[in-house]
Amino acid sequence: MLPRLFLLVLLGFSSAALLRGAAPLTSPKQHFGFAIGDDYQLATYTQTEAYFKKLAAESDRARLVDIGRTEEGRTQWMMIFSAPENLAKLDRYREIARRLARAEDLTDDQARALAAEGKAVVWIDGGLHASETVGTHQLIETVWQLASASDPEMLRILRDTIVLCVHANPDGQELVSNWYMREPEPTKRVLTTTPRLYQKYIGHDNNRDFYMSAMKETTNLNRQLYLEWFPQVVYNHHQSGPAGTVMFVPPFRDPFNHVYDPLVIVGVETFGNAIQSRFLREGKPGATSRSGANYSTWWNGGLRTTTYFHNMIGLLTEVIGNPTPMRIPFIARRQLPANDLTSPVPPQEWRFRQSIDYSLAANRAVLDQASRYREVLLYNIYLMGRNSIRRGSDDHWTTRPARLDQISRLAAADRTGSENNEDSPEPGEGPPSGGARLPQKYWDLLRQPDWRDPRGYIIPADQPDFPTAVKFINTLVKTGVAIHRATADFSVGAKRYPAGSYVVKTAQAFRPHVLDQFEPQDHPNDFRYEGGPPNRPYDVAGWTLAFQMGIAFDRVLAAFEGPFERLPYGQLQTPPPGRLPNARAPVAGFLLSPRANDSFILVNRLLKQGAEVFRVTTPLPAAPAFGPGAIYVPDRGQARDLVRTSARQLGLDVVTVPAAPAVENLLRLAPTRIALWDRFGGSMPSGWTRWLLEQFEFPFEVVYPARIDAGKLRDRFDAIILVGGALSAPGVRPPPTPRPRNLPPEFEGWVGRLTPEHSVPALREFLHAGGTVVTIGSSTGLASHLGLPLQSALTERNAEGRLRTLPDDKFYIPGSILSVRVDPTQPVAWGLPERLDVYFDRSAVFARPSNLPGFQPIAWFETETPLRSGWAWGQKHLKNGISLASIPVGAGRLHLFGSEVAFRGQTHGTFKLLFNSLQLATAKPAAAR
């Protein structure tokens, strides 16, 4: 009795401490002038930032942490909430979370002791997709609740957990809220398309950047997730819920990825069930899961999904809601209770505050679950990390669909003509399920040595584009992966590697993420029913980053050691300084490799300075490995200093030559006047391309449809880039053109779209006048608009003999990586290898024309099995199809890049296609001067 009484007294003192505040707390209504969730009201980031600062100053439960700058220069904030006594030991609890997540040098007993001492760390974010306004505003209300609520449940949550409340997109909130609130009459306010993307470059794709970490905001968030705090639970708020429901809640539909720990999926289901259970207790109907939407746990790259590959429980909800009142529609199939929709919601008018309340209830459910199972969460993240380390330290096999299919086909072939029925059940067993029953020998085949998971990967320092390999290493560094670097030359097996090579071992906690970035994804064949249409993957099916970036690496299947130094976690790498010989003999000029992407940065700097720069059309004896297209810079004036300083900075090795190459083999470069298409509301492919051009220091101008339609483009531009979505193919209905009411005058010139009637004649005129047009993805349809006799390779004749596009049940390749054969003698392909990985997302593929003079195939599908990573149903239809091509049109040139050569800033392996096409747009034979 006495110990229990003593405990109650202690709890009472603790609760009293939580109830005390240093000063009265400012409510959202007092600060913003309206309650969060009021109709027709949105808060700006400027107001939200001020509120965070005010609340942090007033509450002893809160800390405010600056986590970095956004792309537009704003401060990105994270608020940390816990009991005051926990905040006093915040560094200790963060250290416990870090040690358990990395699972290094810990015994199980030590991990249990740390789990008993630690606090569950829960991440709740808001605002990543700024037009999804519930997310930002539930975050504001959540920080208020965490700072002010004094009910027993909240006090327990604060004692047991550390809550990270993270603003995911400050720039977007400022843009969207100001755009909505610009209408002075509240009842006329409507959430419409903003003039530009709600993240400076990539808009909605800010949730597609989390393994690449290209954007500043992504890097800020990843640092907190994988280098600082290691939360066991990450809750990512989104909109909008499926029509006829209120909210999509975990668990998710299949497939889930084969490389991560099953405890991840069990944890996701546990928390999803906790949310749904709370909704039912509180009388909140309308939550759906699994088949209620197409969200899955297959893909890496989103804020929520990348956590799975780091042994964290990633939660996503998608809720309806709008500051302008809306209505839940009547959808008959959403009114019948089912496993994935246990409590349908009636059609009704719906208010913003109702969505806020659902989000708050979901947050409470997650925090309550984390509080109740604090030790389990902490120990489980250790257990998953320990499992990863053990799997990477021993022989381990990941079961993949393609291997199972291969074994099944082998077994079927073995059974042909055999009277032995392997499928007959044993006595006492039911009928076979899940496929044929196979003998043990086929299981043993699945464990053949060559199918083992790698123990590690070696990225050689002597590969043609090592600076890009370093960029790849930095994507791993930013996501918390342990990296080693060789301090001396070493050998593994029969191969020799130079000092400076990087080594990534799989015996580490984040092994799933390591495997995912090096190994091909093997997406299962996923159809609604046998012979039916495919189930579209959530986002993409294959993305192996090492393939996309064109990195040379070796898989090592057995244990290996060497002179390796382990780099500090989070330490970004730079390439070794480029080498430039100190030639004693006279030097005529310098050669740069066309195989290194960063050579284009140096070329752009030289052109900006007015230096002479040439491309060499044939291989040179001084640098035979460069192949055709080497960059030649005469040793003159300031060019010498710029080559020396930039080459060292960029890690570019320079070759000196005593004599200039023959003038007939030189193309003189000049600055290219580049136009990049965009539209009102912003195009994500255009935004990514804008970011890419800035990174590689290309000068360019963004142009809108009205400027293209105005014609006389050759007077101002040398090259025009039309990314995917700029121009619809003939016969394809274009998307509607947004035109908000009360459009400010400065945006009038942004409205409109490219059309066959007005835009194509202007582009034809530009081409005939000597301009270059680079088309990517769907915009390659310009060739048909121009009347060029090009046909798709992905067609068949129907019963009536008419040509039609192959249906999805015969050919379907969502986002995946395919291999093509390249002709590196083509100028646009200079610097590329003969085999290239390209990103393919239902992309254009051309049949070889028989009557198109000057048509130049650049890359084509050479085999019936080009799949490298992802899902390719009916890939045999690609054989001999052309992926990349170039055509002369008048005095100009049209480049057709059916595959996505600049996809999301990730496809470094194909950037040269874009860069060459731009720099060569103004190239002239040097002899013609």
Could you tell me what each predicted segment is?
Residues 1-2:
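N-terminal secretory signal peptides that target proteins for export/translocation
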Residues 5-17:
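Bacterial N-terminal signal peptides
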Residues 22-161, 202-203, 208-209, 214-216, ...:
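Intrinsic-disorder/low-complexity accessory segments
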Residues 153, 161-166, 170-208:
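Divalent-metal coordination cores built from histidine and acidic residues
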Residues 165-170, 180, 236-244, 779:
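Short, solvent-exposed turn/loop segments enriched in Gly/Ser/Thr/Pro and often Arg
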Residues 171-172, 241-243, 323, 728:
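Feature marks short, surface-exposed loop/turn motifs that line or immediately flank catalytic pockets
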